[in-house]
């Protein structure tokens, strides 16, 4: 069993260099549009990655139908693009505006979101409370198809409901985070499963070609260019999606001595080598 946290804009500016946790689940956003991305998502993702903390994500739902849940999934995918997640991407269903839609509709919404994520190459799951999984959702159906993240803060919670991750408090305290934070346990090796399957932005390792061994299969490097900025961006995004390292160098010029001085000054300001 390992221990983790889940965070959103409500935790403010997190000092990830001080955070000690086995994993972190980040709120990517909410609703049906990519512009509803959590204001702290990019910063939290970069900070956790820099600190060496494995991450997953969740999308808070306001959907009222399976079609709206699919739209939420598409928005979520836009926000996740180009990133790598060692833990699942969860559909967070708990809003009071949804609770009277009925078990069939709510369960279908979970399926619509998760199926859309899975078709795009992500390991998807559902987050809800014990109450919702018992009274609002078809837990057995969902647990048979997706990973479950269950919230229950009681000491004597129902242990018979299947789950891989358990949110056990909303009152945790962790160095680097001001105020309270949700704490979770996890009993499944998600990083191993996800990376091996090539999901969540991690491309599958290619099989060696005939006549080459596994070491040779991963020995290729390419220098590409010159390329227009839009083309370079597409290539870099593709390489990162495959889990490959991109060492970028920029060639600028020809230019005047004045322009050269301005470029050198900016490179120095950014801490970049300029030759």
Residues covered by each model-derived region:
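Structural recognition of alpha->loop->beta junctions
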Residues: 77-91, 95-97, 136-163, 269-271
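Aromatic-lined carbohydrate-recognition surfaces of secreted/lumenal glycan-active proteins
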Residues: 120-135
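Short Gly/Pro-enriched loop/turn and capping motifs at secondary-structure junctions
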Residues: 96-98, 131-134, 154-158, 170-173, ...
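Hydrophobic anchor at the start of a short beta-strand
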Residues: 55, 123-125, 148, 246
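Solvent-exposed beta-strand motifs enriched in subsets of small alpha/beta binding domains
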Residues: 57-62, 206-275
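Short beta-strand/turn micro-motifs composed of small residues
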Residues: 59, 128, 152
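Functionally critical loop-and-helix segments that line ligand-binding/catalytic clefts
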Residues: 1-18, 139-214
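Substrate-binding cleft of extracellular glycoside hydrolase catalytic domains
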Residues: 1-123
